[in-house]
Each structure stands twice: as C-alpha cells, then as structure tokens.
Swiss-Prot record:
Keywords: Cytoplasm, Transferase, tRNA processing. This is Sulfurtransferase TusD. Its main location: cytoplasm. The gene is tusD. Heterohexamer, formed by a dimer of trimers. The hexameric TusBCD complex contains 2 copies each of TusB, TusC and TusD. The TusBCD complex interacts with TusE. SUPFAM superfamilies: DsrEFH-like. One of its GO terms (biological process) is tRNA wobble position uridine thiolation. GO terms for molecular function: sulfur carrier activity; sulfurtransferase activity. Gene3D superfamilies: DsrEFH-like (3.40.1260.10). It holds the Pfam family DsrE. NCBIfam families: PRK00207.1 (NF001237), sulf_tusD_dsrE (TIGR03012). It comes from Escherichia coli O157:H7. Transmembrane segments: none annotated. It comes from the Bacteria. The active site is at 78 (cysteine persulfide intermediate).
Amino acid sequence: MRFAIVVTGPAYGTQQASSAFQFAQALIAEGHKLSSVFFYREGVYNANHLTSPASDEFDLVRGWQQLNAQHGVALNICVAAALRRGVVDEMEAGRLGLASSNLQQGFTLSGLGALAEASLTCDRVVQF
C-alpha cells in the first residue's frame, strides 16, 4: 500500500512529529511504500538544520533526513508556512536578502500542489 504523511507539529514540544516518524518507520518495516512526507504549519520546523537537541535526545531532524537518504522518501515543506517561520533554502535566502539559509539537506520547499499530488497518487494520507 502507498502512503503519504502530513506533519503539522514541530520536531520538539509536541508528540506529532515523533509519532509521524515512528509511523513512517513502521510502514517501511512492514513493506509499505512511503511516497512523501509533507510538513505544514508548525511542522516546517522539522526541516530547520539549526535545531540542536540535547545529546541524550533523538535528533528528529536528522532522522527525517536519513529516511530520505535511505528510502527515497520525499520530504516536502510548505513554502508559505516555512517563510513565515524563518525556514529558508539558499534561493529564498538570497531573494530575501538574508545572510544564510537553514533548510536541512534532503528537504524541499514545495507548494500545496505537492500535498495534492500525494493525495491523488497514494492509497492513504495520514495526518499527525
């Protein structure tokens, strides 16, 4: 079965993102196809490479990145939500005159069209 996940909670402070990550791992372990993860609203903080958890905590941002690298899962973040919350790639940083970018490698700034496409091409869309 083909799945897409929507994450609306930040990497830390709520359970949404960590539950979504555990669900993603379980899907893959059971042989399902996870096509994409779409990060929306506060979920865009999952793509901030400046996030620095304590040494005894799981690094969820890097966990998502590994999911992308190892399993080819598309990690799309809503560009409008990201810009409002200060998460930018190099192109947007340049366009906005910012000194640097902070989008974690493996994540892509996307529009809601990426979510619509996932909804049309997947058997299930699960929101956290």
